[in-house]
């Protein structure tokens, strides 16, 4: 095994990491690393206070500490982004992600859960409190009138600052120990796949942000129109379509029993009502009642639009490409061995693997942007959501593929049934 070094950063940014993603977080002008924790198999862990030193000194210190070691971090993409901010660039193969290792052996992904499961050691309980104190804007930024990190907070809270450093160093040590004890679970090939996923996430996917903005505008407009039309037609200005209780009572009053309004249940209810409309024995009043419920369910579908909720997520996290200023990219979208039981790569954020498959005949997206009078309902928008992703080259093509019956072929491979493959 090559020489290993555990690495962990504690950082500051005014951007919400969960909402806006790793790249928006680190591209904020107020982003900065605060502490680095380091650990080696032969020595105890330690931390270095980056906040008190220049970027150049921090780069030299960390670069010298890493030297030619393989870097272990829990959730490598984050540490790689911070290293890149410090102008420290290492090949993806120089990293081992202890979170991937933890998931591979069936443990939790987060270090606070994986460490006690795999090592019998807990993270420091004070971590969340310390992150809130030092890593996000607070009263110091409010007093200063800007969101820049204020080093005075470290002077006024020396004990907590030292605790934060110990917390950072412990995380570096815990991640390293997970790898030392369990890396044998990952074959060299699987480690290569992990590096490929990392590079894929960093390269990202080109996305047409102006098109996303237009689709988002129409999506919200369609929602508002549908809701207002329903309220006007049935004189229901106060009916809350997000209230399960009110929805159940409204449907029950019209002869339709409904216990859930999930996407699947709404589809089944609409199908059941379509059959009732074919029943020649129902009265005119029943027909009107069923039609009212049908309209309510259809409105609920328009308001739900789970696929189109991805539009806002894309707008929240897409960033400009530094090498192609006119191009936006979506990055950090996949988690290697995200599903520990099956070792499947899973999605995060936009969940690109769940994008609706394009029909054989796609719609012209130029019409959407160039003709504001064209009508695109939310179903049509959802059918074409995949088209917001584009080829890198303006004259290129984006090839979209899918494995046919991949699960059955996996089982066939394990069973030696070559005919299925």
Q: Where are these predicted regions, by residue range?
A:
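Short active-site oxyanion
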Residues: 65-71, 237, 395-399
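Conserved nucleotide-sugar phosphate-binding/catalytic loop shared by glycosyltransferases and other
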Residues: 124
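Short His-Asn-centered micro-motif
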Residues: 73-75, 243, 401
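Conserved RNase H-like, two-metal-ion catalytic cores of nucleic-acid enzymes
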Residues: 1-109, 360-373, 377, 412-414, ...
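Conserved "right-hand" nucleotidyltransferase catalytic core of DNA-directed polymerases
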Residues: 1-10, 15-17, 28-30, 35-40, ...
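Alpha-helical scaffold elements adjacent to nucleotide-binding pockets in ATP/GTP-utilizing enzyme cores
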Residues: 79-85, 110-117, 177, 246
């Amino acid at each position: 095994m090559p020489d290993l070094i555990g690495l962990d950063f504690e950082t500051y940014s005014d951007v919400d990491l969960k909402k806006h993603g790793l790249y928006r977080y680190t591209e904020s002008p107020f982003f900065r690393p605060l502490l680095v924790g380091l650990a080696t198999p032969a020595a105890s862990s330690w931390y270095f206070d980056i906040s008190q030193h220049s970027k150049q000194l921090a780069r030299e210190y960390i670069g010298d500490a890493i030297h030619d070691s393989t870097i272990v971090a829990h959730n490598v993409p984050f540490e790689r982004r911070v290293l890149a901010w410090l102008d420290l660039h290492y090949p993806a193969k120089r990293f081992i992600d202890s979170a991937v290792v933890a998931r591979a052996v069936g443990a939790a992904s987060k270090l606070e859960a994986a460490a006690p499961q795999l090592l019998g050691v807990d993270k420091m309980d004070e971590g969340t409190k310390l992150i809130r104190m030092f890593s996000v804007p607070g009263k110091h930024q409010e007093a200063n009138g800007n969101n820049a990190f204020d080093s005075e907070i470290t002077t006024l809270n020396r004990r907590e600052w030292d605790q934060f450093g110990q917390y950072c160093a412990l995380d570096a040590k815990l991640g390293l120990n997970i790898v030392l004890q369990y890396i044998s679970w990952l074959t060299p090939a699987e480690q290569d796949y992990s590096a490929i996923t990392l590079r894929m996430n960093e390269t990202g996917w080109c996305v047409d942000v102006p098109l996303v903005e237009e689709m988002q505008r129409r999506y919200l407009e369609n929602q508002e129109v549908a809701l207002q039309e329903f309220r006007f037609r049935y004189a229901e200005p106060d009916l809350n379509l997000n209230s399960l209780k009110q929805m159940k009572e409204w449907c029950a009053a019209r002869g339709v029993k409904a216990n859930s309004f999930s996407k699947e249940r709404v589809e089944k209810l609409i199908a059941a009502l379509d059959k009732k409309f074919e029943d020649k024995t129902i009265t005119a009043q029943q027909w009107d009642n069923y039609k009212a419920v049908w309209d309510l369910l259809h409105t609920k579908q328009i308001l739900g639009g789970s696929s189109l909720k991805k539009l806002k997520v894309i707008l929240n996290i897409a960033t400009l490409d530094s090498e192609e200023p006119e191009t936006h990219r979506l990055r950090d979208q996949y988690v290697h061995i995200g599903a520990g039981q099956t070792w499947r790569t899973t999605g995060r954020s936009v969940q690109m693997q769940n994008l609706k498959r394009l029909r054989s005949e796609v719609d012209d997206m130029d019409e959407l942007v160039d003709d504001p009078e064209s009508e695109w309902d939310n179903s049509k928008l959802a059918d074409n959501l995949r088209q917001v992703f584009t080829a890198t080259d303006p004259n290129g093509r984006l090839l979209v593929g899918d494995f046919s019956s991949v699960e059955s072929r996996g089982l066939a491979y394990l069973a030696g049934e070559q005919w299925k493959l």
